[in-house]
């Protein structure tokens, strides 16, 4: 069986392979948990090198149903979902016990990253994200969702 390559790459990481010291050891990517900022920056640089992308959008996740459309790397927006049509822009979601959702519509060129916590899920974060994607040209029949 040959799998057709997708033009959108969806990546999940684990906590191994980075430089953060305990209790954040070792591949912590969150800059909001008390880890050494230099370690987080080094881990993020390592991720960028591994996947070959340098432009990221990291969210300030607040357990809301807020969806933000982005078109360039930026300081973390206060949101729980980011959507873009910009090629080469990586959208990042951080989770511990929440569900990360990575969405794409290859034909429309729309991607999204969603932080689906209990409150956001109850308040339709996924539905709001899909609506936002559709407002940018995405169609339900060509959308792909990967749950982490």
State where each predicted segment sits.
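Intrinsically disordered, low-complexity, positively charged segments
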Residues: 10-46
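Ser/Thr-centric signal marking residues that sit
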Residues: 13, 84, 129
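Phosphate-centric recognition/catalysis
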Residues: 37, 41-117
